[in-house]
């Protein structure tokens, strides 16, 4: 069973996504900050990360850079309600 990390400080949205993915057969964990996400990712075992772009302690770009520095080759989908081309380019 695939394991997915959901990173979002909007707890309602994160729990909705967690519930939906769990019903589809995925194992999920949530983190509400980049710091909590780093701790979870360091434990390993994730096959996908779904991350909000703007988090309370750092942004999703900082997390992507940290993951790259740790040589983590986990697919990441960055989510945001701020539809700006600049954000999409920064994530690439």
Write out the residue ranges for each language-model feature.
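Two-component/phosphorelay signaling modules centered on CheY-like receiver
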Residues: 11-29
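Acidic catalytic/metal-coordinating carboxylates
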Residues: 32-33, 59-62
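Short, conserved "switch-loop" micro-motifs in signal-transduction and mechanochemical regulators
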Residues: 70, 82-83
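His-Asp phosphorelay/catalytic-motif detector in bacterial-type signaling
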Residues: 45-47, 70-75
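Conserved acidic carboxylate
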Residues: 8
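Acidic, metal-coordinating helix/loop segments flanking the phosphotransfer/catalytic sites
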Residues: 30-48
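Short amphipathic alpha-helix used as the core "switch/output" element in two-component signaling
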Residues: 39, 61-73, 90
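Active-site residues of response regulator receiver
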Residues: 52, 80
């Amino acid at each position: 069973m695939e394991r997915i990390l959901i990173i979002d400080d909007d707890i309602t949205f994160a729990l909705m996504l967690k519930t939906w993915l769990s019903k589809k057969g995925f194992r999920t964990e949530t983190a509400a900050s980049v710091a909590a996400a780093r701790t979870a990712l360091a434990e390993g075992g994730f096959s996908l990360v779904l991350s909000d772009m703007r988090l309370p302690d750092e942004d999703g770009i900082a997390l992507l850079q940290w993951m790259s520095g740790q040589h983590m080759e986990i697919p990441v989908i960055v989510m945001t309600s701020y539809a700006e081309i600049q954000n999409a380019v920064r994530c690439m």
